[in-house]
């Protein structure tokens, strides 16, 4: 069992120590701001910030410090997930989880069991199915769902969030029929008679969203607390929240004013927000203790590879009539980029397919030439399948690829089918980016993938799944070293949020955000990195999580 310390500790309590704190007898690692790996056995922090790292000589320098026994555990900076969905994670923890389903039938039985336990809920909502892992690999249908739950609407998001599986009741409520047109950037999957089958892809999901029950503040509280509890237990002390609406924007501001955020959050305002212009005019949001920083916008280029929604320059190798979907129309890119960059906000653009990536790079170049914004550390979120000629442009344009290592190990079972061997030369190209000097910010894209950052570190270094398959790793030339992976989850993730001077390491003056873990990831076999257990998580010198014995 795990024990989470109260997430609503006052931030001030982290800043009013009577004496410095000194943790000793640790195997500590951090990167300095130049990227050099430093090892240490002792660390002293005061007022929530690191004041020294070193060896036993710190005992003489700080004789009155409060002593903390490190018990020879490994100490690392708190890990940063550079792309996750905080409320989505909390929501998934409170809904039916279909990631372990072995077939469509297995999934509907899980949904039925959940619906029976939650009879008071007006909708049955879940997430995590992946037809690629099921026999036949075909999309499931509304008719199958109807056999098990037909008295209330059901909405089940695919593992990547880019498709939803719904029952007939949900289609009826949304008014989706044979005559309903596909919305721009979306697709209603139909049978050979044109009738909706129960699968909605990308923007077609919006036809259903407006009918979902409104999210209350109590629901937001439950979601944030559940997500925070899990992330702290996995060693994550800061997360870049990839796409929030006005309700969550206001809620985060309320929680930070109450000194009750469970971890540091760097939210990206969703470009689809109806009040985007209003929020941009309010300027950046930054609290004095660096728990909340809002200075970026998440825009949406295309869908996902698994659902064949990623926008490709040439058709899918396994679907010759399909180029994928542009979620934001090409003609809308210029005004959107100009708006965001013109207000001095970092623009983080979701692009998975090579067409979406090229369009993003083209528009960044155009907007930079006219209104500036090149220094804002703009990002491409995912940057998964890229034409090899476009990779150097990331460096030229100062665009940070924000990438998720476990996407590669999850997608390796279908990526070649989708795009063919030739296009894989520019896919999941972490080492290529690093060799050209591009900082790579690593994350997980939770709840699409599991949030555990040690799963990401393992995938980045081995290019294997947690069964250590394939033997030599998938496209092993793009694997990174442990140090490079560590940097992607610390210093470079902090850099991607303009926070490298306060987070991402444990050098003097940075916040004392750190974790104790049970094994040395720099010394063990890379295949075992994913097994790492977090023993303690600290933020600003306050312990926020302890793993129970």
Q: What positions do the PLM features span?
A:
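Acidic (Asp/Glu)-rich catalytic clusters
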Residues: 256-259, 283-292, 373, 394-396
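Beta-strand-rich structural segments
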Residues: 27-29
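Sec-dependent signal peptide recognition
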Residues: 2-8
């Amino acid at each position: 069992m795990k024990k989470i310390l109260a997430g609503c500790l006052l931030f001030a309590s982290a800043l009013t120590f009577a004496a410095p704190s000194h943790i000793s007898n640790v195997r500590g690692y951090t990167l300095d701001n130049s990227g050099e790996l430093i090892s240490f056995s002792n660390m002293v922090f005061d007022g929530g910030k690191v004041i020294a790292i070193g060896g036993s000589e710190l005992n003489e320098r700080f004789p009155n410090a409060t002593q903390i026994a490190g018990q020879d555990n490994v100490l690392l900076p708190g890990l940063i997930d550079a792309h996750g969905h905080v409320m989505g994670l909390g929501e998934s923890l409170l809904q039916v989880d279909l990631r372990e389903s072995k077939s469509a039938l297995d999934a509907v039985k899980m949904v039925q069991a959940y619906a029976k336990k939650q009879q008071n809920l007006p909708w049955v909502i879940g997430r995590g199915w992946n037809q690629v892992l099921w026999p036949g690999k075909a999309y499931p249908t509304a008719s199958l769902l109807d056999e098990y739950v037909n008295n209330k609407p059901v909405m089940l998001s695919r593992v990547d969030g880019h498709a939803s599986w719904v029952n007939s009741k949900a289609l009826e409520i949304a008014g989706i029929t044979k005559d309903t047109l596909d919305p721009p950037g979306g697709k209603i999957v139909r049978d050979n008679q044109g009738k909706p089958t129960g699968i909605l892809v990308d923007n077609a999901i919006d036809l259903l969203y407006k009918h979902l029950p409104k999210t209350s503040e109590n629901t937001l509280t439950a979601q944030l607390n559940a997500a925070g509890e899990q992330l702290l237990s996995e060693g994550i002390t800061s997360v870049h929240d990839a796409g929030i609406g006005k309700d969550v924007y206001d809620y985060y501001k309320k929680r930070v004013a109450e000194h009750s955020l469970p971890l540091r959050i760097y939210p990206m305002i969703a470009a689809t927000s109806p009040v985007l212009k209003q929020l941009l005019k309010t300027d950046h949001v930054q609290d004095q203790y660096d728990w909340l920083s809002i200075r970026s916008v998440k825009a949406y280029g295309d869908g996902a590879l698994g659902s064949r929604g990623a926008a490709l320059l040439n058709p899918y190798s396994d679907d010759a009539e399909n180029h994928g979907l542009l979620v934001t129309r090409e003609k809308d890119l210029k005004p959107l980029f100009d708006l965001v960059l013109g207000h001095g906000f970092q623009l983080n653009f979701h692009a998975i397919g090579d067409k979406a990536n090229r369009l993003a790079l083209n528009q960044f170049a155009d907007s930079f030439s006219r209104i500036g914004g090149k220094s804002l550390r703009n990002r491409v979120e995912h940057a998964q399948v890229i034409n090899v000629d476009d990779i150097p442009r990331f460096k030229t344009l100062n665009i940070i690829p924000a990438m998720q290592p476990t996407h590669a190990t999850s997608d390796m079972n279908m990526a070649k089918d989708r795009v063919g061997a030739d296009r894989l030369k520019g896919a999941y190209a972490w080492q290529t980016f690093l060799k050209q000097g591009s900082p790579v910010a690593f994350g997980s894209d939770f709840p699409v993938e599991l949030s555990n950052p040690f799963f990401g570190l393992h995938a980045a270094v081995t290019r294997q799944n947690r069964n250590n398959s394939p033997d030599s790793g998938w496209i092993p030339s793009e694997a990174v070293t442990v140090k490079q992976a560590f940097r992607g989850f610390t210093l470079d993730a902090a850099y991607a949020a303009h926070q490298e001077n306060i987070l991402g390491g444990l050098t003097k003056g940075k916040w004392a955000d750190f974790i104790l873990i049970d094994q040395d990831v720099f010394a063990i076999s890379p295949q075992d990195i994913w097994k790492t257990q977090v023993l303690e998580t600290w933020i600003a010198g306050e312990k926020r999580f302890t793993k129970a014995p």
